[in-house]
Amino acid sequence: MSTFPSFDVLIIGSGAAGLSLALQLPNTLQIAVLSKSQLGSGSTSWAQGGMAAVLHDRDSVEAHVTDTLNAGAGLCHEPAVRFTIGRSRQSVDWLVSQGMAF
């Protein structure tokens, strides 16, 4: 009888979201990241270096929310859009603190 490895957390997806989650979980947990291809092969690279984030005073959360909802053609969940964009600066700052170069 074969045995399977045991993990506390299984993360499905190895793009920026999945790998960010893995980095933020406590080191005491046994974590597995499941990817359909090599690690880092998620859709994040499709952004080609671009990222929608409110980083300057001349920009606004409301402008990004409006743009995202318009581009989403009715498919976006507005509370999720507002939550994500409202925290975009924090997310970029965290990525930079982890060594991400933009």
State each model region's role.
Residues 7-33:
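N-terminal Rossmann-like FAD-binding beta1-loop-alpha1 element of flavoenzymes
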Residues 36-102:
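Conserved N-terminal/central alpha/beta ligand/cofactor-binding core
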Residues 1-6:
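A short, basic/flexible loop-to-alpha-helix module at the beginning of a structural domain
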